[in-house]
Amino acid sequence: LFSEYDYCLNIGGFANVSFDNEQGKRIAYDLCPANYVLNRLMRTKGHDYDKDGETARSGQVNRELFDALNALEYYHREPPKSLAQEWVDRNVMPLVEACKDEFANVIATLTEHSAYQIARNFRPGARVLVTGGGAYNVYMLERAKAYADIEFIHPARNIIDFKEALIFAFLGLRRVLNQPNCLASVT
């Protein structure tokens, strides 16, 4: 599925990527926390999410927090690798809670962090299919493009919103057909 793109990026609670490596092997792994942290913080202000990244756009990046987030050990490990809410609670939230900056600046910094971590995983000139709720975060995608020469392609809204359901149906079909439906190289 979606083989016409260099990478498939899903920006949900966590940003994750899948692609075929140089040997033609399918690789998939988590890049970084995304909407899980942003939405959690936005809810403290009565919003479900940062619509179009407007709150982030209104803030300034806190370099100390940005650098601390990017220094986390997970980002220096080779794939396959996977994230979980517990990892965020143990590693990210203490940094966020220790930052006494303005709310918009914290959101700007978390968005910048996600954008940076997303961008650093793509080769220059890549065509990237982007799905998940974060596909609607215009500002995050703008910031990712500032770090790398990448083209984000937005599919039809039903693909953005329901890709995971479609994938699980596809995996079920492969099972019914006695075809492999999981790969060791995918987390």
Describe each region flagged by the PLM:
Residues 24-115, 175-181, 187:
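Conserved ATP-utilizing enzyme core subdomain
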Residues 126-144:
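Glycine-rich phosphate-binding loops at beta-strand->alpha-helix junctions
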Residues 1-6:
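Conserved phosphate-binding catalytic cores of ATP/NTP-utilizing and phosphoryl-transfer enzymes
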Residues 12-13, 87-94, 139-149:
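Acidic-glycine-rich active-site phosphate/pyrophosphate-binding loop
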Residues 15-20, 39-40:
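Short beta-strand scaffold segments in enzyme catalytic cores
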Residues 115-123:
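A short, acidic, amphipathic alpha-helical segment used as a generic capping/interface helix at domain edges
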Residues 146-167:
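Conserved phosphate-binding/catalytic loops in two-lobed NTP-binding clefts
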Residues 8-10, 31, 131, 155-162:
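Active-site nucleophile and cofactor-binding loops and adjacent substrate-binding regions
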